[in-house]
Amino acid sequence: EAMPRVTAVEVAGPGFINLRLRPDWLGDILKRVEAQGAKYGHSNVGGKKIVVEFVSTNPNGPITVAGGRNAAIGDTLCSLLAAAGNTVSREYYINDALNSVQMNNFGRSVFTRYRQLLGHNDEIGEEMYGGDYVVDVAREVLALHGEAFVNADIDDPQTTRTFRDLSEKGMITQQKADLEAFGVTFDTWFSEATLHADGRVARAIEIIKERGYTYEKDGALWFKSTEFGDDKDRVLMRSDGTPTYMTGDLAYSKDKLDRGFDRAINVWGADHAGYVARTKASLAALGYDPARLDVLLYQLVSIVKGGEVVMSSKRKGNILELKADLIDEIGKDAARFFFLMRSPYSALEIDVDLARKTEKDNPVYYVQYAHARIVQAIDTT
């Protein structure tokens, strides 16, 4: 068959064929690249309205290095979908309906640090959160409220609630700042708590009950998720009347599609693989096509420095922070490059020492060097 863009076809050893392309056609491509600039390669083939939910770190800790891989994958996926002609919304799901014990302990941790900043010698309990990020949130509370809470009793329910809320807001502010330093911003920060507060969770459960996909056992309300391919049925409401984590998820998935999105894409860590079947099952039980939800699972990431895997942050704490332990070490651009250099489905190891090198074995430097040479060549023509 004729190939007008090819001038010659040559066999080049066993298993290889060389295609020689017409120079004038290649020249035309370069002209289009120059004319279209950043829009080169874009198309209108998509035409869908898509919401991509990614990162969604709990509001009781900073964005971790693993969360950084999630951010790089999700943000790039959004850009690709938009370039293909889709209307894309970047969404961060705030898990602010977390177990009250977790968030209350986080609030207590911030309160203790807050009083320490004011010169008190309060002890940090074993159940409390460590890490410099807790001190950062306490500093923000101090900056906003001064000594207003210095004599407060953390065992008082009102004080507990106040510091839970202040700590959550302070942590989310820190998360936003870390993500912006990584070049990632969101169109929507969606609160899980609102789903419970305005009845959307209760309504979703009611729909599943009306459609006959629940039963009661041992005082709890169960979802017949096995009828949709899940490996076992799931509890929706515990025997004490409290909802499980799944109820917020199913109401959130429903809400996305109710907002008019044709497709929803979630970017999750591989440790959440078990949630995929039950999430799709809940959509089917609610009467939606589960194929409208896609889940991209990515593998873990580790940091290597001095030939050793880094196990703890350079700041106090037992987690690796995206900003302090990676961006501040190698820069935003290098961090994003390394996160995207391997398939999301493969485990990733980032060598900090390699990323800092100004030699060709550092892939970031090699690409930047090639770009600089190309620009130089253009400037001399």
Identify the role of each PLM range.
Residues 1-381:
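NTP-dependent nucleotidyl-transfer catalytic core
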